[in-house]
Amino acid sequence: MKIPLMMVIAAMPLGTLCAADVLPLPEKVACAIADKQAFQQPDRVHLTGWIGSRMEASAKNRLAKINPDRLLMSYEHRPGCQSYDGEHIGKWLHAATLAWVNTGDPELRKKMDQVATGLVKWQLEDGYLGTYNLDGKPWARWTEWDVWTHKYNLIGLITYVRYTGNKELLPACQKMGDLLCKIFGDEPGKLDINTSSAHVGMASGSILEPMLQLYRLTGEKRYLDFAKYVLRAWEQPNGPKIVSVLLEQKRVDKVGNGKAYEMLSCISGITEMYRTTGDPKLLQVCLNAWQDIVSKRLYFTGSTSAAEHFHDDFDLSNTNKVAETCVTVSWLQLNMHLLQLTGESRFAEQLENTVFNHLFAAQLPAGTAWAVFTVMEGKKVYYNSNSTPDVTCCLSSGPRAVALIPCLASSVDSDGVVVNLYDAGTAKLTLRNGKTVVLTTETIYPSDGKIVITVDTESATPFAFKARIPAWSRESTVKLNGKPVKVDKGKDGYAAIKRTWAKGDKVELNFKLEPRVIAGERSNIGKIAIMYGPLVLAADEATLGKEGLPIGAISIGKPDLASLAIKPEPAPEKVKTWPHALVFHCNVIASEKPQEIRLMTFADAGSFEESYKIWLPLSRNVLVDGTETRSRKGDGTGSIIDENETSFVNTSDGTWPKEDWFAVTLKEAKTISRVVLMHGKTLNVGGWFDTSAGKPRIQIQTQSGGEWKDAGELKDYPATTGDKAGPLKEGESFQCQLAAPVEVFGVRVTGKPSFGGNPNQAFSTCAELQAFAK
């Protein structure tokens, strides 16, 4: 995998296929709210730069190579091999159809036809198109992921029908919709949609989105009535209270059980309900959710969620199941909806951040595989068709996001054309007055900040050319036909040039690409991250120098830009994933000696089977070279000095001592001023420190083999008792700042163990014990 990546991508000639040039089936019901920015058909925008290379990799190496028999297997042989196995075919149809419209690939179209007709073949007479059995072995109908599967079958088939014009499959969609209307509702004898799936009904409730699409496509009011029922059901005592909580508390972590993917899927449905009915409070629901995520729950890499859920404010783990790819995709979709509905550039800003960083970081550059979680440090674990399980939810979701990119990369609004994402390529746009404008973009962005866009019109035409000026760009210039022009941002956040345009007019944008240092906060105190333009950078063992340095050896001596001396340079062949890929020179400290290393983009980091890290410590954890011990051996196999917060040790041995401790001793004295403890795991029979007798204490050895002396306590450790862990979370970190720097031969944390629901024993756990000079 390490060497052939560039060979695989280079072998895919961009632009060799022509767009499908389709005319989608029109909707019979007009939306109450017209989009301010128009969703573009994928054949209108062709991207050939870095984004385009990732799109083509996804289309050719994943979507076109899927085995239709695998997608249909769980329908042919009910029940499915996974409880959610039925979702994959609808997700694939959605992504493949969009990709086919963009490329016109005839082989992909053949496979789409085969899959779509093959799926409908297994629809039962009553309209059922899931993978569950009536006898409930092993899954009973209308439980777990059954409605969810119908959601994705509707999304996939509706997309296929609209773009191919194959109306013969529309009745299958209506039969599904009619069955759902018959089964669920608040009338006597019908099932409650809240109790028909996991996650407080949010999985089944996400059927809202395609039912509204089905309503607008067919004009059948019963589908709108069903959608209104779903909204009512959410507010019942057993419902997730999505609308009321987001209007009143404005916190996504308080909605339902906080499950991010399902919740964001429901919120996308709410955008469709607002678009369909015009109820202004529904838009406010979505804006409140967006603002809460952006301000308190978003990784700066452009995704959200940890362990698949929204958590307390700023609770963003670096390693614990970070940013499920399904959540990344749903976050991108929400921003696309809000960009359409409001026309505001702040949503396009989020799109760029997500696409260039966390979305592409989850995708193997060759397009063949996707990560389920994409951690901020560690290794990426990719899944493809040869993985076990052979199809994960994220492997099916990722290509959907990639296929959606051209739909809003460029767009039109009531003023003219809008450019949201920058990549080489062309966009053929139709103004509101019916005239055609073609934009041809020449750039190697984001490797260079120069972007030249040629505007071609059928005749001299007045309209506004709107460009998104990235928020990170401190210096931006705009030229029109070679001459500088001053443009101010409008209320929508875009810089607009309003004039009568002629064929061949050129707009030149220059954004100053420069490094930025991001200071770590909360659990990342004592660390920095580095960005270059829109790109998040990472240290990867694949580019750490001839010595093959381990990632744990790297620290930042001085965090100012002058000392770091970050400079872009062409990527070496072994890590070049597209022709203009860059790596970035950076001065660091490696094993306490000055060292030059090369950083790479987060999007590419980890794709060469090596460990990587985004947050770089200002000083090295001095305990990683030590020897760890604990008060009792316990029954775990982890470590407290492996720099992995998901690995932990415990002291469980069936006894109940007054105190537990975890220690690391050193052969040579090291100067420290700060100690960090990361909690291990909270179990129903203990695993935490009981603070009823006092907060956990930090102790040190100032002589080799000497006595342990108290040096401070973990004041930020939460209030707990022997049987209650309080708000403690797995991998949560706590810090003790020492009164003054001190030379030590050992560090340990000491506290009272907990017993949970078994008072006949007590134990504690620890994921990491760290000590730093700064």
Go through each PLM region and give its residues.
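Solvent-exposed beta-strand/loop surfaces of large extracellular or lumenal domains
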Residues: S473-K498, V517-S523, G712-G726
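Aromatic, loop-rich ligand-recognition surfaces of beta-strand-rich domains
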Residues: D642-L714, L728-K774
